[in-house]
């Protein structure tokens, strides 16, 4: 008995000693990450290969990695830098560590798949760095499964397709630039109108995106997803670029580094774009952009970015044409029934982004913005259906001022026990839109107003708050969050002889929960669930006296991201989205239409492969089943909802002096009306981009639609009547896609 007791006591003592040894030797590894010039690197991925713990550098390049022991292998990864592996020694644990990353070409070796809710954004940014975009709207195509189409002379915001939504110009996807919203509430042309043309593509640094209503810091318009573009805080070199090509196309771009010091940077960017397009009636398109940006950073204390920009454009358009007009030989594919369509628009922005460092792991982020915006658009979709003498041209107009602000407190590293970590953020903000003279009118030749269909002033305010938590224990990460939105809608009908102002308000709570399981640094699985809401127009809300102001959206994603080798990344997602009853304001007709409840389910597959240091391949395939749940079978199609899409390509970088890209996009046939009796034809289009560098000079070749495919960029089932017709016809009306389009480019950096 005594011998057994003594043995048991000795064994217990040994276990306690081992446990105490592990506790005292499993420590926080702290340090800083910089590049070779000493610049601090933010958001560097850090992974302990031995323990499975992971972290990221903060805004000051600092990091803390729990459960680190001597001889652990720590991986440091960041896009554009060689992956660095640190073997921990006692000095690292007691004194901290400074990690210096060397710059290199972008490749998949630098991607670590850990428990990040936005892990796909980091992967897609490899695509962007390997294939720089040629327009600000084009960057939206970098979001897997998102396609766009232009149908009004290049000046309108593009039509967007994502996850079984014909999003029109932005109704169900929240788009922002450095946190400043792009979508326009209660817009003259339609809810959520998102014109990104005020962004100069050469100033884009990276893109952050997410699909579904799973993100507490995103509210209005975040149904199918969100996209946030981040602009460069500074530029390394100044640059001049000139581009010329078919259809009288000319584009001038200049980026000028005007200030560079230890704490401050500033640059100015400008763009002038001119083209007539491939249409028989010249588009006479012109766009001017100018941007100025100042960045100040006092390490460990504060960071400030001030941005001012102005954009304006003007254009003519040939509009959407009916197939029968081509079949009868009245016009060609690039002709027009009414070539007096077109418009003009402008936007001026002032932005402030400020971060106050309250401590090593605490930040207070504040951003504020004000925008002045105007819009005028002339369209004719039905030709002579309503007015057989003067035609059906309409004018949509508005004059808008937007202002908003947001403050977020972040605590990014709170120890919970020995290994677990918790972080959270809490935010409060508002947005206010003052829209004057928003109108829809029947016009003649852009000169004469024949009748006002709608005319009024809109004031809309959104006040919101949210709290977002993230708890990591072992291989699990739990991300619960909740958002509160309050909306106030006011619409004054100025067509009424008496004062006619209607007002409604509504609040909604949107909880979300994302769960991630990380097998290792190269494999994660995730389950995302969330409640959101479908954005609504003030004219819808007041017309329906507050009924179904903010119809709920219920979302669920189940998926995985895996790196089977250092050179390959694969992803797969099953998802579903249910939308409650919604009312839609049809800006082209000035009427309110109910669209009923809808259900969308789908699967997304993607792959990226770094075949060599200079060759990169990628592809994304998406299938969606989208139906109305309140209609009979066969009559429950959602018009223009895409069911099968695919994008992909290959990129060549640093092959001697050469670089280039070959990309494709595919959109399958889809129903254009509720019973699928009218079909919008799909397309497969390929683009090519080649560059040759000589010292600080770059000579480039850009080819859109390499194989000169005949395709329809945007399509609608529309009832119209031509001047010589006695009865109307409903059929596909479309804007033809760009034919073979060749441009040359020369750029110099200095």
Which residues are covered by each model-predicted region?
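Extracytoplasmic beta-strand/coil segments of soluble accessory domains associated
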Residues: 137-184
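Short, acidic, small-residue-rich periplasmic hinge/interaction motif at the N-terminus
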Residues: 44-49, 77-81, 92-130, 137, ...
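Gram-negative outer-membrane beta-barrel transporters
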Residues: 409-412, 487, 575-578, 594-674, ...
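Short strand-turn segments of transmembrane beta-barrel domains in outer membranes
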Residues: 206-216, 224-259, 270, 278, ...
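Short acidic/polar hinge/loop motifs at secondary-structure boundaries
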Residues: 64-66, 181-211, 230, 545
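C-terminal beta-signal and adjacent terminal beta-strands/loops
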Residues: 617, 669-670, 692-750
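Transmembrane beta-barrel wall of Gram-negative outer-membrane proteins
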Residues: 241-274, 279-318, 342-359
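Face-selective signature of the C-terminal outer-membrane beta-barrel domain
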Residues: 300-311, 343-494, 522, 564, ...
């Amino acid at each position: 008995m005594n011998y057994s007791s003594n043995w048991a006591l000795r064994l217990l003592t040994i276990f306690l000693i081992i446990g105490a040894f592990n506790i005292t030797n499993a420590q926080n590894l702290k340090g800083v990450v910089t590049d070779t010039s000493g610049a601090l690197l933010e958001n560097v991925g850090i992974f302990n290969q031995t323990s499975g713990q992971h972290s990221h550098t903060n805004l000051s390049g600092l990091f803390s990695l729990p459960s680190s022991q001597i001889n652990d292998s720590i991986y440091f990864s960041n896009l554009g830098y060689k992956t660095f592996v640190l073997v921990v020694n006692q000095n690292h644990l007691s004194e901290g560590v400074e990690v210096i990353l060397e710059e290199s070409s972008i490749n998949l070796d630098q991607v670590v798949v850990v428990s990040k809710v936005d892990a796909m954004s980091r992967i897609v940014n490899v695509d962007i760095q390997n294939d720089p975009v040629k327009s600000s709207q084009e960057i939206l195509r970098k979001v897997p499964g998102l396609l766009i189409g232009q149908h009004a002379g290049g000046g309108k915001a593009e039509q967007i397709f994502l996850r079984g939504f014909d999003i029109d110009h932005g109704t169900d996807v929240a788009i922002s630039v450095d946190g400043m919203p792009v979508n326009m509430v209660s817009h003259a042309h339609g809810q959520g109108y998102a014109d990104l043309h005020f962004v100069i593509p050469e100033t884009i640094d990276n893109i952050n995106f997410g699909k579904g209503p799973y993100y507490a810091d995103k509210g209005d318009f975040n149904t199918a997803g969100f996209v946030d573009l981040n602009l460069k805080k500074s530029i390394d070199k100044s640059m001049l670029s000139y581009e010329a090509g078919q259809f009288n196309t000319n584009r001038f771009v200049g980026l000028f580094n005007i200030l560079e010091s230890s704490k401050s940077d500033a640059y100015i960017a400008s763009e002038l774009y001119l083209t007539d397009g491939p249409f028989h009636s010249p588009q006479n398109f012109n766009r001017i952009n100018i941007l100025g940006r100042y960045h100040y950073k006092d390490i460990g204390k504060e960071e400030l970015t001030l941005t001012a920009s102005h954009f304006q454009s003007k254009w003519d358009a040939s509009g959407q044409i009916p197939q029968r007009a081509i079949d009868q030989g009245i016009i060609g594919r690039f002709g027009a029934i009414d070539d007096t369509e077109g418009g003009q628009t402008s936007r001026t922005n002032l932005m402030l982004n400020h971060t106050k460092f309250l401590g090593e792991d605490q930040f207070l982020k504040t951003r504020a913005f004000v925008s002045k915006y105007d819009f005028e658009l002339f369209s004719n979709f039905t030709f002579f259906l309503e007015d057989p003498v003067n035609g059906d041209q309409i004018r949509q107009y508005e004059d808008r001022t937007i202002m908003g602000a947001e403050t977020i407190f972040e605590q990014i590293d709170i120890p919970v026990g020995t290994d677990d970590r918790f972080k959270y953020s809490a935010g409060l903000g508002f947005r206010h839109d003052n829209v004057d003279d928003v109108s829809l009118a029947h016009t003649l030749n852009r000169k004469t107003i024949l009748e006002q269909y709608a005319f009024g002033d809109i004031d809309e305010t959104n006040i919101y708050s949210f709290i977002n938590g993230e708890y990591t224990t072992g291989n699990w990460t739990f991300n619960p969050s909740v958002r509160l939105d309050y909306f106030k809608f006011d619409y004054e009908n100025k067509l009424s002889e008496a004062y006619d102002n209607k007002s409604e308000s509504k609040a909604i709570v949107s909880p979300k929960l994302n769960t991630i399981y990380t097998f290792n640094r190269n494999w994660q699985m995730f389950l995302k669930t969330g409640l959101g809401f479908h954005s609504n127009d003030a004219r819808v809300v007041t017309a329906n006296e507050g009924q179904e102001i903010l119809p709920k959206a219920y979302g669920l994603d189940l998926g995985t991201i895996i790196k089977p080798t250092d050179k390959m990344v694969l992803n797969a997602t099953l998802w579903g989205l249910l939308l409650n009853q919604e009312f839609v304001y049809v800006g082209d007709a000035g009427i309110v239409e109910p669209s009923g409840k809808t259900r969308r389910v789908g699967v997304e597959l993607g792959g990226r492969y770094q075949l060599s240091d200079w060759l990169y391949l990628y592809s994304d395939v998406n299938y969606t089943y989208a139906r109305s749940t309140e209609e009979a079978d066969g009559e429950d199609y959602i018009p223009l909802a895409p069911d099968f899409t695919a994008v992909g390509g290959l990129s060549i970088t640093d092959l001697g002096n050469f670089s280039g890209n070959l990309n494709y996009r595919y959109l399958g046939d889809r129903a254009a009306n509720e019973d699928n009796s009218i079909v919008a034809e799909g397309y497969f289009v390929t683009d090519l981009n080649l560059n040759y560098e000589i010292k600080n000079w770059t000579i480039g070749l850009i080819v859109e639609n390499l194989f000169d495919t005949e395709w329809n960029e945007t399509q609608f089932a529309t009832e119209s009547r031509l001047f010589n017709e006695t009865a109307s016809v409903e059929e596909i009306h479309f804007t033809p896609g760009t034919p073979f389009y060749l441009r040359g480019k020369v750029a110099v950096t200095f």
